[in-house]
């Protein structure tokens, strides 16, 4: 295969990674049809380039290191340079896409609360005591869905929760400094 075809194949794989869609197999077949590859070889070639590009972006490899590593694996220098150039041209775009698609934990969207004076309840043994009604609204960043998590606790348990959360916040602030 020529250097130009290797670069075009690498660009196809990068485009597939960036868009999140499947690779256009017809374009890839046109690129490699003269090389006499069978379907299995084409799939292996795509998988290898995908692995190289994905892990190079993930591990923040620079262009020269990528080229050197590929040469050490036995690839011709011209092919290594073609892959490295295509990688360099699209690296920042892929990094931003990977960053946006990383695991994001749900966050607290809002908190509603109220204190009720309970005359009778299934969950609290003490009647005629205050009870705290909490409703956490949690935002899931992967699908932007907000879910409600309501619950009821006694005033004593709320005080314990409050002071433990204050202590945890203080510990987190000291670690961040």
Curated annotation (Swiss-Prot):
PANTHER family assigned: COMM DOMAIN-CONTAINING PROTEIN 4 (PTHR16231:SF4), COMM DOMAIN-CONTAINING PROTEIN 4-8 FAMILY MEMBER (PTHR16231)
Stated role: Scaffold protein in the commander complex that is essential for endosomal recycling of transmembrane cargos; the commander complex is composed of the CCC subcomplex and the retriever subcomplex.
COMM domain location: 107-176
InterPro entries registered for this protein in UniProt: COMM (IPR017920), COMMD4 (IPR037356), COMMD4/6/7/8 (IPR047155)
Family the entry assigns: Belongs to the COMM domain-containing protein 4 family.
Highest taxon of source: Eukaryota
Protein's UniProt name: COMM domain-containing protein 4
Pfam families in alphabetical order: COMM_domain (PF07258), COMM_HN (PF21672)
GO biological process, one term: signal transduction
Oligomeric and partner information: Component of the commander complex consisting of the CCC subcomplex and the retriever subcomplex. Component of the CCC subcomplex.
